[in-house]
Amino acid sequence: MYPLGASYDGAGVNFALYSQVAQKVELCLFDEHDVETRIEMTERNSYVWHNYIPGLHPGQRYGYRVYGPYDPVHGLRCNPNKLLLDPYAKAIEGNIDGDESLFSYWFKSPDDNSAMNDLDSAAHTMKSAVINPYFDWGNDQHPYISYHDSVIYEAHVRGMTNLNMDVPPDIRGTYAGLAYPSVIEYLKKLGITAIELMPIHQFVNDSFLQEKGLSNYWGYNTIGFFAPHNAYSSSGERGEQVNEFKSMVKAYHRAGMEVILDVVYNHTAEGNHMGPTLSFKGIDNASYYRLVEGDQQHYFDTTGTGNSLLMRSPHALQLITDSLRYWVTEMHVDGFRFDLAATLARQFQEVDKLSAFFDIVEQDPIISRVKLIAEPWDLGSGGYQVGGFPSSWSEWNGRYRDTVRDFWRSQPSTLPEFASRLMGSSDLYQVNGRRPVASVNFITAHDGFTMNDLVSYNEKHNEANGEGNRDGESNNRSWNCGVEGPTNIPDVNDLRQRQMRNMFATLLFSQGIPMICGGDEVARTQQGNNNAYCQDNEISWTNWHLDKGRKELLAFVSKLIHLRLDHPVLHRRRFFTGREPGDDSNMIPQVEWFDHTGSIMDMDDWQNTHAFSMMIYLNGSDIPEIDWYGNRMVDNDFILIFNAHYEPIMFTLPDERYGRKWQLVVDTHNPNEPALSYEAGFMITAQSRSFLMLMSAKKPKKPMGL
């Protein structure tokens, strides 16, 4: 009877479906000509409907028809005229076309709950497919890269390779394309340790987008939590996409890189009461969805998509945890980024980090071993939960993004918070015993401006989305450097390039886990569109034809990543401890903060609302950790100089107690100049809106950590 879903054993296929409200369930098998054969299933126990069919093979397409009460007012939406996807389908064929038959109500009378739409949806919906679970993984293993050694690259399967001329045309925009040797070599050379894929669970292409000639490019509209999205397959949709995905993961593991999935367990593609009936609604609506108390025809929505999964339902929780385990054990992925993760913690009204979902994940021997990253907010009351997740989780740090953007556009009163974000956001995470890796630092992501657009546009330009430029965030914390959009003015373009270098340097030399939005390292632009969720075209795809400036930015970013990875003081496991009142003035702390005169910053400096510069000393000799060889970690010392002023500032380097000789290793104003040497107390100019990094000339006395 178990497991749920369709299980091939070499001789036939076992089908199992959970539905508490069903009065009858039919298994529907489809042949090559779409002729349907219906087989009645048996409810054995615990509301699981079962059938074993000998002689069936992988590639067999199927669906379910569920007979039961249709009473939307009370949250019951069974309709046997709708062919339903298996919630546990491992592969899904096709997509939906927006036909009226997909809906349980009639378009002419959408508010008439008693009038059930009896049009058959089989010809207009997706079909589940049986897969062959056997795959030659060889000696594949999870890389298990430490959090603090990680550099994450957010990528889109299609957007990463659709314009990549090094990838064969027939596999561009697919799992196979993403696994092509030149793509993996590019990421490896860049210094990436993990690729984080935007949603690849089977999702729906919404009919309202299709009508406008657009598509659901981002994929945050899941309908199949076990099935890799079929449109990203170059080999087929009846299970071939599963093997293609596995081969991709295997290729990344062979290169020593991890694969993290962006997963959307907070809602499904069935939308609100006006949405289609594709799977869960028709199987057991009230067991999967959170309904409005006292008004069960409507869905409680904290996601902005029309529905939210019912996180206090054992069956919804089982679906999610079974899915997570499947992707780890069978598909070999290395972690998950949870979209709108605050919704997963809502057993009732409030976000609760002691919720059943977190308890289950924490205790699960499989899920708890991989990387868990939260988008720590949703659209509900009290949904902004940055810093509020359990200790085993990392979080997208939205406050990091906002603060770094504000600092580099010279917003008042940003210096103290900017300093905290650089050091791993201890104010957000240390209070409950977490470490710097709780913070996934990012400046840009798929949602919003690209790095290039962040320095090129003050306003969003989303006209191509067909919503009158009303969609997307209006407060982008961006600065166009004086001209809106593309320009031929050399000074403006030079400043934009420098601002991108400044932000990359900030990101990659901050404590925590850096995440790069794919294509930012080559100055990808979306032409000012900050909500390109529906743009499956050149607006979203990365253009790999690199001019001189884009090649130079790529080389610069790669240099910074490798600097970070080579020096443990730049990605510590634990928070820095600074100078405390009463400490010996001759003691050299783990971190020290200086003004431009070389004096230790005092309270007046921190409270200066128009201070946009500082100098930071990082003590590489005081890392309270051991390396892989069991030796105490010792690294070079570093000085970081930030100047977000519109004028140059002369900085006096610290006295010789902090180091006698220094080598300039990064200068965002002159990134290609040869390294210069400086001595303690010397003066160095930080040009307007620039960043400098100096490294001590001394060599570590013991091996550094890997």
What residues fall within each predicted segment?
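Carbohydrate-interacting/catalytic domains
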Residues: 1-153, 158, 487, 492-497, ...
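Substrate-binding/active-site clefts of carbohydrate-active enzymes
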Residues: 121, 156-332, 340-363, 383, ...
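Core domains of carbohydrate- and sulfate-ester-processing enzymes
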Residues: 68-137, 206-221, 275-300, 415, ...
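Conserved alpha/beta catalytic core and glycan-binding cleft of carbohydrate-active enzymes
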Residues: 353-518, 523, 531-535, 568-575, ...
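Short, flexible loop/turn elements at secondary-structure junctions
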Residues: 21, 43-45, 55-57, 68, ...
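Hydrophobic faces of well-ordered beta-strands that scaffold small-molecule active sites
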Residues: 151-153, 195, 259-261, 336, ...
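Conserved, mostly hydrophobic/aromatic
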Residues: 17, 64, 155, 197, ...
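Short catalytic/ligand-binding loop motif for oxyanion handling, primarily in non-cytosolic enzymes
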Residues: 71-75, 161-163, 203-207, 267-270, ...
